[in-house]
């Protein structure tokens, strides 16, 4: 079962958790930590669009969950001084849903579509002319009396976010003038984020404790903030309210987050590949079945970090465990078979 701090679905958070997440979210570029090159470029693009009194070019933000795509979308809207309308790909089931959103946008407003790779193909086609020409064709009636009516739209900026940019169609991808990929964070930046969030939450934290949480956060700010909130609970109930390194280590152990930031499901994936399938290669659907998890969840939430950190290899024949995975699980790697001439 997926841990809540790895949950890529922001909508699954409770109302109080959503309020806390909003409070922790930066609202301007100056408060956003990390992704320096991306932020520097976006500052220039936003300022130039404002000076020309033009809509900002459409923006595609892609990368693993929890790195700040939604936060950047809100910051862009704030910096533009524009309203933002928020939706997601699966919600836009019919062209009429999209038309309703687009026709209600004011001049230079921002439309943010999360999980844009999951757009209905029919809806996506309607989006093309809206993005290029700020027009949309809608069908009135049906059958022999059906007719198409073209509606003019206010100039707007579409911001799309996706964890799986490879699933975007070429025509849709080509219509984004600004295409950026967010990268995992290093421990130094995550430590800064943990300390900033602790100040907002008004919870004292030791430097060593902030570092401890940061280094086990899988390079992901959202996970760092969630671990901070859970550790705050332990500090409140079992300590003096201050998050010490000892409290942090105790909380992380209780949450099954090991020294390398891997949780119970990470270790289950690795041990499944090694113990049930002799280290691989093995297909993702087979791994998902063996681990009682969805293939999409493994691909989007767990696999990117495991590959990034060198625990997994992705090959044409499937996933393979690396020597680092064997070492992490304290297992002996298999001996390579000798060649004919050895």
Curated annotation (Swiss-Prot):
SMART domains: AAA (SM00382). ATP binds at residues 24-25, 66, 69-71, 132-134, 175, 185, 222. Mg(2+) binds at residue 70. DNA binds at residues 314, 319. Residues 259-342 are annotated as: Head domain (RuvB-H). Keywords: ATP-binding, Cytoplasm, DNA damage, DNA recombination, DNA repair, DNA-binding, Hydrolase, Nucleotide-binding. InterPro entries: AAA+_ATPase, AAA_lid_4, DNA_helicase_Holl-junc_RuvB, P-loop_NTPase, RuvB-like_N, RuvB_C, WH-like_DNA-bd_sf, WH_DNA-bd_sf. One of its GO terms (molecular function) is ATP binding. It is an enzyme of class 3 (hydrolase). It catalyses: ATP + H2O = ADP + phosphate + H(+). Residues 1-185 are annotated as: Large ATPase domain (RuvB-L). GO terms for cellular component: cytoplasm; Holliday junction resolvase complex. Residues 186-256 are annotated as: Small ATPAse domain (RuvB-S). It comes from the Bacteria. It is found in: Cytoplasm. Its EC number is 3.6.4.-. GO terms for biological process: DNA recombination; DNA repair. Pfam families: AAA_lid_4, RuvB_C, RuvB_N. Has 3 domains, the large (RuvB-L) and small ATPase (RuvB-S) domains and the C-terminal head (RuvB-H) domain. The head domain binds DNA, while the ATPase domains jointly bind ATP, ADP or are empty depending on the state of the subunit in the translocation cycle. During a single DNA translocation step the structure of each domain remains the same, but their relative positions change. The RuvA-RuvB-RuvC complex processes Holliday junction (HJ) DNA during genetic recombination and DNA repair, while the RuvA-RuvB complex plays an important role in the rescue of blocked DNA replication forks via replication fork reversal (RFR). RuvA specifically binds to HJ cruciform DNA, conferring on it an open structure. The RuvB hexamer acts as an ATP-dependent pump, pulling dsDNA into and through the RuvAB complex. RuvB forms 2 homohexamers on either side of HJ DNA bound by 1 or 2 RuvA tetramers; 4 subunits per hexamer contact DNA at a time. HAMAP family: DNA_HJ_migration_RuvB. Belongs to the RuvB family. Homohexamer. Forms an RuvA(8)-RuvB(12)-Holliday junction (HJ) complex. HJ DNA is sandwiched between 2 RuvA tetramers; dsDNA enters through RuvA and exits via RuvB. An RuvB hexamer assembles on each DNA strand where it exits the tetramer. Each RuvB hexamer is contacted by two RuvA subunits (via domain III) on 2 adjacent RuvB subunits; this complex drives branch migration. In the full resolvosome a probable DNA-RuvA(4)-RuvB(12)-RuvC(2) complex forms which resolves the HJ. This is Holliday junction branch migration complex subunit RuvB. It comes from Amoebophilus asiaticus (strain 5a2).
């Amino acid at each position: 079962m997926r841990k809540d701090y790895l949950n890529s679905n922001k909508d699954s958070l409770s109302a109080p958790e959503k309020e806390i997440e909003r409070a922790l979210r930066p609202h301007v570029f100056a408060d956003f930590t990390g992704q320096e090159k991306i932020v520097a470029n976006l500052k220039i693009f936003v300022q130039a669009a404002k000076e020309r009194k033009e809509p900002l070019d459409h923006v595609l933000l892609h990368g693993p969950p929890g790195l700040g795509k939604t936060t950047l979308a809100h910051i862009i809207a704030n910096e533009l001084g524009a309203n933002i309308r928020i939706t997601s790909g699966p919600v836009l089931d019919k062209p009429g849903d999209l038309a309703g959103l687009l026709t209600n946008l004011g001049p230079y407003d921002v439309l943010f579509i999360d999980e844009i790779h999951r757009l209905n193909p029919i809806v996506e086609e309607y989006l093309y002319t809206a993005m290029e020409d700020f027009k949309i064709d809608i069908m009135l009636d049906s059958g022999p009396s059906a007719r198409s009516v073209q509606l003019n739209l206010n100039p707007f900026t579409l911001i799309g976010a996706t964890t799986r940019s490879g699933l975007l169609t070429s025509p849709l991808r080509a219509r984004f003038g600004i295409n950026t990929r967010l990268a995992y964070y290093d421990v130094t930046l995550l430590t800064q984020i943990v300390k900033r969030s602790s100040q907002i939450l008004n919870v004292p934290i030791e430097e060593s404790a902030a570092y401890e949480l940061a280094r086990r956060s899988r390079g992901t700010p959202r996970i760092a903030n969630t671990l901070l909130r859970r550790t705050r609970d332990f500090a409140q109930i079992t300590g003096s309210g201050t998050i010490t390194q000892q409290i942090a280590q105790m909380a992380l152990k209780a949450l099954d987050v090991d020294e390398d930031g891997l949780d119970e499901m990470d270790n289950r994936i690795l041990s499944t590949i090694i113990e049930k399938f002799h280290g691989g290669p093995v297909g993702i659907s087979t791994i998902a079945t063996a681990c009682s998890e969805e293939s999409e969840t493994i691909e989007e939430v767990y696999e990117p970090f495991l590959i990034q950190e060198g625990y997994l290899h992705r090959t044409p024949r499937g996933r393979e465990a690396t020597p680092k995975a064997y070492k992490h699980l304290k297992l002996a790697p298999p001996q390579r078979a000798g060649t004919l001439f050895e």
